[in-house]
Regions:
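Phosphate/ribose-recognition catalytic cores of enzymes acting on nucleotide-derived substrates
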Residues: 1-90
Length: 90
């Protein structure tokens, strides 16, 4: 269950007992017209399929609020800035 507020987070993900640094977005994805609340996580240094596997995500630190971007390019640019910032924190 998720009780955190919407936003972008520095996070940690556990897959099959291995722990990875990660970046997560909790919210409704307003830039792409999303309405359902969901958690999306990018796991740094992980490659492979996760479909059908159990995974644990821990939200460690909120980086910023979720917001709507006018273009997908603006969204991509912000995601890269968030990624760089989070990697500097670890």
């Amino acid at each position: 269950s998720v009780t955190a507020e919407d936003g972008v987070y520095r996070s940690r993900a556990e897959v099959d007992g291995a722990v990875y640094d990660a970046m997560s977005n909790l919210g409704r994805n307003p830039s792409v017209g999303g309405t359902a609340r969901r958690l999306e996580t990018h796991i740094f240094g992980f490659s492979g399929a996760l479909y059908g596997r159990m995974l644990r995500v821990e939200l460690l630190e909120k980086i910023r609020d979720e917001r709507r971007f006018d273009t997908l390019e603006e969204l991509r640019t912000q995601i890269e800035k968030d990624r760089e910032y989070i990697l500097k924190l670890k």
